[in-house]
């Protein structure tokens, strides 16, 4: 009659058994984490922008560049926006942002100064959370990659004339630019509503941030 072998398993076999169970444990843990995340997202109130600050429309918060556009291009400005002031500024700002999104400007330009790649030396201090706490950043436009310069604090860096020339023919102001022409921002050589609006938006970016 045979005897029962009670000798311990070889060391390699005893170590292999827990390792064989590891993928199953990892799968179960992954599903548990997934369920927890779904439940938390389902029961947690997600911010819809109720507590964010809106761009302040009073005259003192409107960049000087907006009034300069009205002086430099009085006829198209009045035709499309009326007199320069809080109401026309809000309209231009909204249309400008919509144009920025529709034209894919966010694909080549960021609105976030990062702590890497020499960004602070080129564009100033690293972007902080409160800097984007306004309704114009819902949804955010941090960008997808950096082809052109960061625009997070573009306000006042360049003149309106520079932006007009740049949109009309980018290589006229930067021979190595890969940016396309935006001729549909103009009627003849003067900016139309989209042209005035997107320049207004760009000249606003960062104007609501106290520079230190």
For each feature predicted by the language model, list its residue ranges.
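Electrostatic cytochrome c docking/interface patches
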Residues: 65-101, 113-118, 212
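Residue-level detector of secondary-structure transition/capping positions
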Residues: 104, 113-116, 171, 206
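Alpha-helical transmembrane signal-anchor/signal-peptide segments
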Residues: 44-65
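Gly/Gly-Pro-rich "capping" loops immediately C-terminal to redox-active cysteine motifs
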Residues: 77, 89, 97, 112-165, ...
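C-terminal capping alpha-helices of c-type cytochrome domains
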Residues: 18-43, 160-212
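N-terminal positive-inside, membrane-proximal cytosolic segments immediately preceding the first
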Residues: 1-25
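The canonical Cys-X-X-Cys-His
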Residues: 96, 102-112, 163, 179, ...
């Amino acid at each position: 009659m045979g005897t029962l072998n009670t000798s311990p398993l070889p060391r390699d076999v005893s170590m292999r058994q827990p390792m064989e169970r590891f993928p199953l444990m990892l799968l179960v843990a992954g599903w548990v984490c997934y369920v927890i995340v779904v439940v938390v997202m389902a029961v947690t109130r997600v911010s819809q922008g109720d507590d964010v600050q809106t761009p302040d429309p009073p005259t003192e918060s409107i960049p000087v560049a907006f009034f300069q556009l009205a002086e430099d291009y009085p006829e198209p400005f009045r035709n499309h926006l009326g007199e320069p002031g809080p109401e026309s500024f809000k309209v231009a700002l909204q249309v400008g942002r919509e144009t920025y999104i529709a034209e894919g400007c966010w694909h080549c330009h960021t609105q976030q100064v990062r702590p890497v790649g020499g960004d602070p030396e080129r564009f100033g201090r690293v972007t902080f959370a409160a800097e984007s706490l306004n309704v114009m950043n819902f949804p955010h436009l941090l960008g997808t990659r950096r082809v052109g310069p960061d625009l997070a604090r573009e306000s006042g860096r360049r003149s309106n004339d520079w932006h007009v020339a740049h949109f009309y023919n980018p290589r006229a102001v930067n021979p190595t630019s890969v940016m396309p022409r935006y001729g549909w921002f103009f009627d003849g050589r003067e900016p139309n509503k989209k042209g005035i609006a997107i320049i207004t938006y760009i000249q606003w970016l960062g104007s609501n941030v106290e520079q230190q």
